[in-house]
């Protein structure tokens, strides 16, 4: 179970890094927001879901 938590945290860190780099690039590029809006919202939704799943799995271990 500890390995599952570690993998979830690794995925959370990786997705956070992608969003921290990707969102400002999309917002700074002219015209990219309209093309990438759905992708950014999907990434934010995945990040939120991953935080919730990680917290639920962590609560089962403790």
Curated annotation (Swiss-Prot):
Task: Give the quaternary structure.
Answer: PSII is composed of 1 copy each of membrane proteins PsbA, PsbB, PsbC, PsbD, PsbE, PsbF, PsbH, PsbI, PsbJ, PsbK, PsbL, PsbM, PsbT, PsbX, PsbY, PsbZ, Psb30/Ycf12, at least 3 peripheral proteins of the oxygen-evolving complex and a large number of cofactors. It forms dimeric complexes.
- Entry keyword set: Chloroplast, Membrane, Photosynthesis, Photosystem II, Plastid, Reaction center, Thylakoid, Transmembrane, Transmembrane helix
**Mind telling me what this protein is named?**
Photosystem II reaction center protein Z
One cellular component GO annotation, for this chain's record? chloroplast thylakoid membrane
Question: Which organism is this entry from?
Answer: Pyropia yezoensis (Susabi-nori)
The subcellular location is: Plastid, Chloroplast thylakoid membrane
Which HAMAP family does the record associate with it? PSII_PsbZ
BP-aspect Gene Ontology terms: photosynthesis; photosystem II stabilization
Function of the protein: May control the interaction of photosystem II (PSII) cores with the light-harvesting antenna, regulates electron flow through the 2 photosystem reaction centers. PSII is a light-driven water plastoquinone oxidoreductase, using light energy to abstract electrons from H(2)O, generating a proton gradient subsequently used for ATP formation.
Q: Its principal location?
A: plastid
Q: How does it sit in the membrane?
A: Multi-pass membrane protein
Family to which this protein belongs: Belongs to the PsbZ family.
**InterPro entries the UniProt entry points to:** PSII_PsbZ, PSII_PsbZ_sf
Q: Which Gene3D superfamilies match?
A: Photosystem II PsbZ, reaction centre (1.10.287.740)
- Is the keyword tRNA-binding in the record? no
Q: Membrane-spanning residues where?
A: 8-28, 41-61
- Signal peptide range in chain numbering: none
Keyword Endoplasmic reticulum assigned: no
């Amino acid at each position: 179970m500890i390995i599952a938590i570690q993998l979830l945290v690794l995925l959370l860190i990786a997705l956070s890094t992608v969003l921290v780099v990707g969102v400002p690039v999309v917002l700074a590029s002219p015209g990219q927001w309209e093309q990438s809006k759905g992708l950014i919202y999907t990434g934010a939704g995945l990040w939120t879901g991953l935080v919730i799943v990680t917290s639920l799995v962590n609560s089962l271990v403790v």
